[in-house]
């Protein structure tokens, strides 16, 4: 027997309903249809609100980028071949007001420049967008925001396509010999608001436009197999098939990090980097052990984010045990903090270290702790 755990009541009800019809079993569930209608209306309202808000926000970002970077972009040489690094920028990613410090790739840019490469960075801004754009404008490094390369016309066309798109699986999808097609379609119909991102889709246009302007021999990006990544890679390969894409896995990979574990169907239909570099050999083994056979080459590499640890002295273990609680950048993480503190606060032999996510500092969740 197989067990599928479903944490949404309305989806569970709908699956039982469809199963009952198939097996000619009477199914009685008071107010199921009413709940479904209410849920559908809620989903539609939230979806349109999210898309319109995203559309307006992107329009603002596109024109803000063009206001600051239009002349700078015109003066950038298009004859050189660049190593392009796709990274991120926070408000704290700057020193001396005129230098950008890459929070994910450290000194990689400086190393490549020393080795006679032309380097350009393109970043997603996380935090106060206008403040970050102003700081990017004043720095010495060649760094551009992703939104600079998005066409307003493409934004409008993509927006119309997304709001009229109906997500539906047409083929039978099996997991452990169980047909999950109906489940997936029910999920998609009620979670469209969470599954579609206008910004993620537009990474195709952004990277495609950039690679039509600038020549690139190598494109380097973070690699977590997030939704924006295949759109980014598709845009690059469409504009410049010869560009080699290197995905740098930059953090811990556990046995339940399923976003890293791709099987044959996904590998066949998903654009991936030409090579994936991991943080050390252990991470490499975990990904290889849980992936299909046609996965791109995986190489063990260094931890660029943690270069500062080379300066640290080795610390010997103490009797007091430490537990590191690394938080995600989502609002509900306070529940994890509360759980850990409640369970372990009375144990004097354990020290709890809480590491907040860069986009969600403790100051934003401490009211719930």
Task: Annotate each PLM feature.
Residues 1-369:
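Catalytic-core helical/loop segments in enzymes performing group transfer/polymerization on anionic/lipid-linked
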